[in-house]
Structure formats: C-alpha cells, structure tokens
C-alpha cells in the first residue's frame, strides 16, 4: 500500500502528525488539508517552507497555527477581509495549546516547561480549523 493511500484513511489530524516526521509544522498542517486545497504538494511545501521554528524561524507565531491560517484563507477567502475568522482560529488554537508563540509553547526562557509538543500543536491546529470550517 502506498503511503498516500495509507494516510487517506486516517483522521486529518493524525495525517498531519505523520507529515510532521519529514516536514515543518506549517507544512504538515498544509499537507493534511491538501485534498481540499487542490494545490500540488510542491506548492504547499513551498508555501510553508519559511515557517519552521515559528514564523521566520524566530520562535514567534507557531508554524502549525500559520499553516492552519494559510489553509483557512485558501479554503474560505471570498474577496472580503478574514480578520474575524483568523482571530477565531488563533483563539481556538491558543485555548487548545496554551499559547501561540513557538518559544512559549516550547518553554524557551520559561520555568513552565513545554506547554505543547510540536506534534500536539500540529494536531490541535488541524482540529481548530476543522472545528471552524
């Protein structure tokens, strides 16, 4: 059985976790929504390439959240501003994960430790977007 066939029977959130093995968090979320986005895998990988270790590799906004917001725009954009929807997705992700910045989620410069693993951030980003779709 080919990998894509195997993954197609899995819940989207678990597909994203599987994609995380070989890709960054943003790419993993985008690939999980690939069938609905109707874009070549190479394009999705390119779109998410600069979001590893948080936005711009600076441990800022979590790449998984960025991927979910890119997917949200691709799925729902209708030539109107999407600020309310983007805000809802951010809030839903933060509720599930405890923060939105990569360095906060990973416990960098904090005594709290890891709030949410990368795998769980990817899983929760997919769940949050599915909830809002």
Predicted regions located by residue number:
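Acidic-glycine-rich active-site phosphate/pyrophosphate-binding loop
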Residues: 2-5, 30-49, 95-103
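Domain-length accessory/inserted modules outside core catalytic folds
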Residues: 6, 18-20, 39, 44, ...
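C-terminal binding/interaction regions
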Residues: 3-6, 83, 87-133
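Polybasic, low-complexity association/targeting segments
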Residues: 1-18
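Short cysteine clusters
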Residues: 25, 62, 102
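Buried hydrophobic packing segments
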Residues: 29-33, 65-75, 125, 129
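Phosphate-handling active-site elements
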Residues: 37-46, 74-87
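Glycine/serine-rich anion-binding loops at beta->alpha junctions
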Residues: 51-71
